[in-house]
């Protein structure tokens, strides 16, 4: 397996053709796997918003006040409302908001980003990352797979890693159940998440901060 970072990508704006910019900067062949940060997919889909777009509900105000009392720092109730709007379920409200997005991803703050947002305040995740991945896949001239990645924390582990939140043209998992180990013991529960392993590998090249 070889990994290549794509150089020369411009800052993506609403409506930009991401596959065009990728193919302009790297030669692709059938079977390649393209991993794309959710940040640029969201930007191309016009998911950058301002906090003024959100009117806090009573619940958002309550969450913001609870956070402020526990963390001893303010939380904008408009951001809390954006998180509520982007979530199908709130699992934990304080000391952080752990939620399930409408497409089933479990994450903090509905994956809303406050960095690399351009002239806007926040950047929401794509509405349906797997549909986004499928749409991107169809635009490439080669038969490639597409994985959309995001950075995510892990329970009881320090630091964040890249994970897959949408994909097209590739199997998500490798099922080892029914296979045997070196001692002849049958594997009963092992299902390998290929997508997240590839996302973490790609994140080593993507980096964080000013790479968005």
Model segments located where?
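N-terminal and secondary-structure boundary signal
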Residues: 1-212
